Amino acid sequence: MKWTDAQLIAEELYDRNPDLDPKTVRFTDLHKWICELENFDDDPNKSNESILEAILLKWLDEFE
């Protein structure tokens, strides 16, 4: 997975944390968790606030 795979990343995060409300997650934690995903293989330094926000919004869709 790459940073551009927001939907896939969001689904993985939801599957790992189905009871965690994404609205309570800090971007620093989100970044760390994404980089720790087994299938994630992108450069950790290539993320930015808009990418993390897009992933968080997709995760919120999964959560609700």
Swiss-Prot record:
This molecule's function is given as: May function as iron donor in the assembly of iron-sulfur clusters.
One GO term of the biological process aspect: iron-sulfur cluster assembly
Protein name in the entry: Protein IscX
Cellular component annotations (GO), alphabetically ordered: cytosol
Q: Which family does it belong to?
A: Belongs to the IscX family.
- Organism (species): Haemophilus influenzae (strain ATCC 51907 / DSM 11121 / KW20 / Rd)
Q: Which NCBIfam families match?
A: iscX_yfhJ
Alphabetical list of InterPro entries matching this protein: ISC_FeS_clus_asmbl_IscsX, IscX-like_sf
**Coiled-coil regions, chain positions:** none
Gene symbol of the encoding locus = iscX
Listed GO molecular functions?
ferrous iron binding
